[in-house]
UniProtKB/Swiss-Prot annotation:
It comes from Saccharomyces cerevisiae (strain ATCC 204508 / S288c) (Baker's yeast). Component of the COP9 signalosome (CSN) complex that acts as an regulator of the ubiquitin (Ubl) conjugation pathway by mediating the deneddylation of the cullin subunit of SCF-type E3 ubiquitin-protein ligase complexes The CSN complex is involved in the regulation of the mating pheromone response. This is Cop9 signalosome-interactor 1. GO terms for biological process: adaptation of signaling pathway by response to pheromone involved in conjugation with cellular fusion; cellular response to pheromone; conjugation with cellular fusion; protein deneddylation; regulation of protein neddylation. The keyword Iron does not apply. It comes from the Eukaryota. GO terms for cellular component: COP9 signalosome; cytoplasm; nucleus. Keywords: Cytoplasm, Nucleus, Signalosome. Disulfide bonds: none annotated. It is found in: Cytoplasm; Nucleus. Component of a COP9 signalosome-like (CSN) complex, composed of RRI1/CSN5, CSN9, RRI2/CSN10, PCI8/CSN11, CSN12 and CSI1. In the complex, it probably interacts directly with CSN9 and CSN12. Interacts also with RPN5.
Length: 295
C-alpha cells in the first residue's frame, strides 16, 4: 500500500487559502506538490518493518483556479505551476486534493471528481485526497481524521485507499520559555543595522507577540525598500531583467508567508526569513556597486 506523508505546513496552507477565499463554490481543488522519499532522505521514516510500496512527501499545494460548471482555467493553472517552479525547480505534482464544503451524496461527488480529473490527465496525477470541512474541526487531529487518500487509476478513476501520515514539523528550541535570540538595534554601527543577541525574556518581560509583530513590520519595510530599488534600477541587459523578475517573485512569496500571522514555530520561521531577506539585500547592494563601477 502506498504511503503519503504530509507536512503540517501544507495542511495549514490549504486551510489558509480556503479561509481567505471569497468563493462560494462547493469544492475547492488543490494540486499536491512534493517529492519521493528514499532511505537517504532525512525525512525517511521506516514503517515498523512493513515498508510501503511507494512513499511520497507533500510539502506544498497549488490552488486550482475553477470556473463555472467545474471547468478549470488551464491558463491560470499553468502560470501558477510555472511560478512555483521558479523557486522550486525539482517539484513533482503528485496528486489533487478536493476540499468539500457540503455534505453530498458520494455518487455526485465522484462524478464531479471524475470531471475535474479528466481535465488534468496531462499531469498524470497519482493520488486523490478528500478533505471534508462541512463540519467544524475543533482540533488538528479532527482535521487530520477528515482526510482520506486514494490512488488514481486510469487517470480519472478512484482506486484503492492509501496510508496518510502527518508530520508535525516541530522545531526543538532549548529553554524556549527563558531565552530567545532576537535582533536588537545597534546605532553605533548603523542606524538600520540589527545585531543578534540572547535576551532573557523573564527578566526583561518582553511581550513575545508584540516582538513578533514588530519584527514582521520591520521585515516588510526592508522588503518594500528592495522592491522600490529593483523597480527603479536602470538596467537594459536581459540577464538582469530576468534575475530581477525572479527576485521580485521570491519577495512576493516572502510577503505572503509573513502576512499569514503567527505559528507555533514563529521564531524559527522568522530567523529563516531574516536570513533570506539579508541575502536579497546583499544581492541588491552588489548590483548597486556594479552599476556605480560601470559609470
Amino acid at each position: 500500500m502506498d504511503l503519503l506523508k504530509f507536512s503540517s505546513l501544507a495542511i495549514s496552507e490549504i486551510n489558509f487559502l480556503h479561509e481567505s477565499s471569497f468563493d462560494s463554490i462547493d469544492h475547492s481543488w488543490f494540486l499536491l506538490i512534493g517529492c519521493k522519499l528514499d532511505q537517504d532522505d532525512e525525512i525517511y521514516i521506516p514503517i515498523n518493518g512493513n515498508e510501503a510500496e511507494s512513499q511520497w512527501y507533500i510539502e506544498k499545494v497549488i490552488r486550482i483556479p475553477m470556473q463555472e460548471n467545474d471547468k478549470i482555467n488551464q491558463e491560470r493553472l499553468e502560470r501558477r505551476i510555472n511560478l512555483t517552479k521558479v523557486t522550486q525547480k525539482d517539484i513533482c505534482i503528485l496528486g489533487i486534493l478536493d476540499l468539500c464544503q457540503l455534505e453530498e451524496d458520494e455518487n455526485i461527488t465522484n462524478k464531479v471528481t471524475e470531471k475535474v480529473l479528466t481535465q488534468l490527465t496531462a499531469l498524470a496525477l497519482k493520488y486523490l485526497i478528500k478533505y471534508n470541512v462541512f463540519r467544524q474541526h475543533t482540533s488538528f487531529q479532527e482535521a487530520v481524521n477528515s482526510l482520506k487518500g486514494y490512488k488514481i487509476e486510469n487517470s480519472v478513476q478512484i482506486g484503492a485507499e492509501i496510508i496518510l501520515d502527518f508530520l508535525q514539523d516541530k522545531v526543538q528550541i532549548k529553554d524556549v520559555n527563558d531565552r530567545y535570540q532576537i535582533p536588537t538595534p545597534n546605532n553605533t554601527v548603523d542606524p538600520g543595522f540589527d545585531e543578534f543577541q540572547l535576551i532573557d525574556m523573564k527578566d526583561k518581560e518582553i511581550n513575545i507577540q508584540k516582538y513578533n509583530n514588530n519584527t514582521i513590520r520591520k521585515l516588510l519595510e526592508k522588503i518594500n525598500r528592495m522592491i522600490i530599488f529593483l523597480k527603479n534600477y536602470d538596467a537594459t541587459d536581459k540577464p538582469f531583467s530576468s534575475t530581477q523578475d525572479v527576485i521580485l517573485r521570491k519577495i512576493s512569496m516572502l510577503v505572503t508567508q509573513l502576512q499569514r500571522g503567527g505559528t507555533s514555530d514563529m521564531n524559527y520561521l522568522l530567523d529563516n526569513k531574516i536570513n533570506e531577506i539579508k541575502l536579497l539585500e546583499i544581492s541588491c547592494k552588489q548590483w548597486e556597486i556594479s552599476n556605480m563601477l560601470k559609470k
